[in-house]
Amino acid sequence: MHNWIIIGGIQGMTLATFLRKQKGVAPEEMAIIDPHEEPLSEWRRCTEAISMPFLRSPFVHHLDVDPFSLNRHAKASLFGEGASFFGKFKRPSLLLFHEHCEHLVREQEIRRSWIQGRVESIKRLENGWKIHLENGSLVMGANVVLAIGAGEQLHWPEWAQQLQTDSPGSIFHVFDKELPKFDASQAPFTIIGGGITAVLLTLKLHKQFPGQVTLLKRHPFRVHDFDSDPGWLGPKYQQAFHNTRSYVRRREMIVAARRKGSITRELNAALRKQLRQFPRLVADGHVHKANRQKGITSLFDEDGSLIHQTGTAILATGFQPQLPGSSWLAPIIEEHRLPCAACGYPVVTHTLQWGPGLYVMGPLAELEVGPIARNISGAREAASRILQAQ
């Protein structure tokens, strides 16, 4: 039996690093369950799909325990410190961040703990938990940490679902595993969205296919350096959040704090620079219906008026807000009467304990950690709290 079973990707990797370095947990004492063959492969796939050059978070947010670990790694790397960070907040390049992650994977022997598989069910034992995987394997451990994200819950608006049903291959989600190569898709391209993912993808495709790309957004660009106020990283906002006993109110605070669909200043500047030469690169419109005839996809608003026509539509519409892993979480919530708020998310202790030997991170922890829960900063906070309970 393992001491720790961690279910999840980048959040779980953060906890694994903290357990190895701060608690001396050996690789064979941990089991990291993930559907993918390699650590962080899904994170890499998504960030590479949009050619993200720099992370949105500052240099102290990464998977290692020491906040300055990434900075030291940059000084010792081939990239050099000057080319590795952007702006006054020293946001790390994606290449540096990936290299640092791989360094930690090797250094902490994470692959020795890696188990590729999908969770089918979880059962409580007298002294721990038993995880059933879809491939028939069983994994048992004293403590289980649910660090699952929302990465497999892609948001497809109703009109997009209908278009995909009626005309397969005419529309994709940018984070779809089946996303084809762009040069094999029909131009022109229309990106649906208005946030950082949409703008990064627009700039990427515009470079490949100049004059054949349009970003279709339904709201003005919301320009912010970060996806929530930095005050949420400390007591400035966290104190009031934790003093709030109502979980309905906490959910309202989380929704209000998130700068959903926002972009950074340098992306806004880069897009506006291209707009001077290509004024049709960005258009406004809220799609309610779509159809495809004779190889052309037509997009319509709620009044049925034509907004735009395209060859291939690509959604950059984010993820669905419901509870991650609900299909296999629902039975254990009911069986063990695990506390949940009205929104369906876990109600946990300060150390993120949901039940005996059962802990949460990421989206599942946001009613306790706050709006940063889904970010790398939230992963570090969650890992620190879980270790406090040991």
Question: Where do the protein language model's features map onto the residues?
Answer:
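Flavin (primarily FAD) cofactor-binding/catalytic cores of flavoenzymes
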Residues: 1-37, 84-196, 200-208, 214-390
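Nucleotide/phosphate-binding site architecture used for ATP/NTP-dependent chemistry
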Residues: 48-55, 61-69
